[in-house]
Each structure stands twice: as structure tokens, then as C-alpha cells.
Amino acid sequence: MDRPAQFAGVRTDMDFNIIEEPQVFYCAPADDYLPDPEAVMITGITPQQALAKGVNEAEFARRIHEAFSVPGTCILGYNNIRFDDEVSRNIFYRSFYDPYAYSWQNGNSRWDLLDVMRACYALRPEGIIWPENEDGFPSFRLEHLTRANGVEHEHAHDAMSDVHATIAMAKLVKQAQPRLFDYLLQHRNKHKLNALIDVAEMTPLMHVSGMFGAARGNTSWVSPLAWHPDNKNAVIMCDLAGDMTPLLELNADELRERLYTRRDQLAADQAPVPIKLVHINKCPVLAPAKTLLPENADRLGIDRQACLDNLKVLRQHPEIREKVVALFAEAAPFTPNDDVDAKLYDGFFSDADKAAMRIIQQTKPQNLPALDLTFSDGRMKELLFRFRARNYPNTLDDAEQRRWLQHRQEVLNAERVQSYLLQLESLYNLHEGDKEKMALLKALFDYGKQLVG
């Protein structure tokens, strides 16, 4: 998991007028971490700059958590639900904050403008200029949208510049399509979304998702088949524009194997499984099927009649529902990870452990070694050691310093360093002649050399 170098945010009212001073601050990288060179190429923030300007991750997490936890806050970004929010959860997890509560307690919520823009293009495109990428499909990259619509966004991927660009695009959608904007804002709430979903009748819905691809405007009609057997926030949806053959012909095990096979690895005669999970706690775009007007369906290349024919097939074959429930009853294949930093999703913390986390937060750094806490969760002890080592290394005794050095040697091993150097070499060949990029790559090389010794 990448670690953040910079945070930027600003509080606005519901009309996107800025009502507080913007916040911009940096995070100093820990000494057991080599930054992702690709990320540095995009942001332009070298690890040396982050070290010079940044606070430690504990303070970085505290400031973000404080801003996010103000009652009534809605956290809005651009692709934040799939990217930024994951980074936030992980730094909260490593810093002993509840990784989830900030986004729902005290009337708080989150929302993502990326899917709002996709929905606007698919359903109500008027009033916004939609740029195309080199393949002739609409581009939803923030810098492309701002340029096409005359929005100032001089330093794309600079965090504060991206914040202002996101605000400007949100204002534009609200102005151009106020009814759609308000509908999507109201339906960021999982209880509102839940009310749309009728599994018993398989009532079709319009769904916007990047998984559908730009060729059809990231849009389709879907039918809810069943709730996920283990995750109460996930509903199993069938893409009605897909080929129903696999659902009819394959058993649950065969469906599972094909579902988790990359599309470019399927044989020419193997249709993809037209199934996806929709997580109602991740602000998905769902609306009644009629929201996709015939003229917009035609523009996007979606055959509404074919979708209705497929819906008829689903209703005539109740065994399909049983198969997809069985498919998801067995966990998706994954590689277990022994690294405690990567174990955020290994389970929720107990109330007793949450109480211990609050004690850790309230304890002065110099008093952390003397804490005598009992944890029921196996992750907590190692997390606390790493928290001290990264943020307050002067609190480690001699044995702990040796232990941390061993951890660093294991993480920054020869294989990891070789991979880092190969990545730098590849980027050097890609950007040869670009002075700015060369300077960034030199900084990354120097930092790696200094870190590994």
C-alpha cells in the first residue's frame, strides 16, 4: 500500500463556497519505506521534500482525522472512494484511529465526484463539454475535464490544485444538471440505495461503474440477484447487457473460476461472467431503469430490448440465483499477507481494543514504552511497536532498535531494492531529455541509496 506524501483539503458549504482556510501539509516518509517512483513522477514531491516539510505519520493522521471527524462533514474527492479513502483508512489503522467511524458517525458521509461525472455524461450530458481520449471515448480525467470546460487547473496532481478543480467541476454539474446532482447527493446514503434494490422481483436498475468501460459510457442496466452471503453491504448484480450463457451453462465452481480470470486471458469462445458486486456503502450510482432514456441508451450503444430479454431469462431460471450465491459463499482467491501493515481488513477491532487505541492516542510519546496494555487482537502489539519505531524512534530501547533494524533489512531486502532500481531505470528511459523528470529520478536514486546505505 502506498503511503501519502501530502494532504490538501478545504471545507465548503453545500453550494461549494469555501468557508474555512485551506489545509495543506506533508507527511515525512518512514525509514522502512521506499516511495513509489510512479507516484513521485505524478506529484513531483520527492521524499527529500516530504522529509523537510513533513510531520510524522502519527501527526499527519491526527490532523486529517480531526478535519474528517467534524460532525456533518461530507468528504468529497475525485476517485477518493477507491483510492484516497483506502490510503486514509490505512494511515488511521496504523495510527490507532477507528478506520471507518469518521465516514459515518455524527451525521458524516462520503461521496465521489468521479462517478457523478460519469453519470452526468451517461444520463444528462447537456451543459458540460465532454473531452475525448485518443481512442475516441469520453475522458474522465480531472485535468481533461477542467481544460475542456475552461476551469483553471494549472498544476494537475498538485493536491490543492486538484481540490479547487474538484470544487469547480462539482459546481458546474450542480449548475448544469441540478436535479441529477441532488438525486445523486441524496443517494450517496446506503439506506436510500437499499430502498431501490428489489431482489425478489429482480427489478432492473441503471448503474454507472468504471468496470463497464468507456465504450458504453461506463453504464448498463443491471438486475439484483441476491445479497452477498457474508457482506450485508454488497448486492450481487447481473449486467443485463452481458451474455447470459455462462450463467445458464456453468456450475458455481466454474463460474467462480471464470469470474476471477482476467478478460484478456479468456479464450475467444469464453464469454465473461456478467456478474458484479455493488457495495451500497461505497456510493455507487444506482437509479430506476427508466432514468436511462432511449436516446441516451442509443448514444451509449446499450440495447434496452436485449437487456429486457435477458431479464426474462433470469426470471425463468431461478437456479441462476442459487449458483451466484454459492459462487460468493466461498471467498475470492487471495494471497495471505503476514505483514501487519497490510491487515486492515483482517477483522474489526473489539470495544476493549478500541479503548486501548484511545489510551495510545492520549499518551505522550515518551510515556508509550511504559504502557501496560492487554490486547485481544493479534495485530495490536506489532502495530504499536511499529508506530513507536516510525514516529518516535527515540522511545526504543537497544533491543527494540535492533528489532527495528532487522525489520528494515527484511523490508528493504535485495529483491525490493533491485525492483526499485529497475523501476527507476525504466522511468529514466521513458523520460530521457525531460529535465524535471530527470531531477525527480535523481532524487529518488539518492534517497534510496541513503536509506539502504
Per-region residue spans from a language model:
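Conserved, well-structured beta-alpha core segment at the onset of a catalytic domain
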Residues: 54-55, 63, 70, 451-453
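Metal-dependent phosphoesterase signature
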Residues: 43-60, 67
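Short acidic, Gly/Ser-rich segments with clustered Asp/Glu that frequently serve as metal-coordination loops
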Residues: 1
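Short, glycine/acidic-rich hinge or "gate" loops at secondary-structure transitions
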Residues: 160, 179-191
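C-terminal non-catalytic accessory extensions
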Residues: 400-453
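Acidic catalytic cores of enzymes that act on phosphate-bearing nucleotides/polynucleotides
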Residues: 186-266
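Metal-dependent phosphoesterase core characteristic of DEDDh/y 3'-5' exonuclease domains
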Residues: 4-5, 11-12, 17-43, 66-178, ...
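Long, charge-rich C-terminal accessory regions
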Residues: 229-407
